């Protein structure tokens, strides 16, 4: 598999839409590159987006032995290991999307998304939408 692009919206420290396209310069000709930046700039969130889109999981939310619920909007709570916690606070929806080339040479797109009711930041988190793949 070759990652061609990572994009998303409103995930953790990355507000609004973001995209990294590995098919255009300067990344298309780079053999190796570094993801660097200040604390909170979104380095880990980029990797979370990749994992969410491909596997519906994020390593930072690996299941622990404890089940701790965190406060969400209103009186709602959400488990600390729920990947929907990656939705940026104060936003109504978010997604992670990855374009990749498979070993068969075809291009694919994988997408994970989350939203709140009525598309309002004050709405309850909706049940998680499963990952979808397109060819």
List PLM regions with ranges.
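Extreme N-terminal "head/tail" segments of very large remodeling/mechanoenzyme assemblies
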Residues: 1-133
């Amino acid at each position: 598999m070759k990652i061609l692009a990572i994009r998303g919206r409103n995930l953790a420290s990355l507000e609004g839409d973001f995209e990294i396209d590995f098919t255009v310069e300067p990344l298309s000709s780079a053999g190796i590159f570094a993801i660097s930046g200040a604390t909170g700039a979104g380095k880990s969130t980029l990797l979370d987006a990749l994992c969410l889109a491909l596997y519906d999981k994020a390593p930072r939310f690996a299941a622990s032995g404890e089940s701790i619920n965190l406060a969400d909007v209103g009186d709602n709570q959400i488990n600390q290991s729920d990947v929907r916690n990656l939705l940026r606070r104060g936003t109504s929806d978010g997604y992670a999307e990855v374009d990749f080339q498979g070993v068969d040479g075809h291009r694919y797109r994988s997408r994970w998304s989350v939203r709140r009711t009525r598309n309002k930041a004050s709405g309850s988190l909706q049940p998680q939408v499963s990952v979808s793949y397109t060819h």
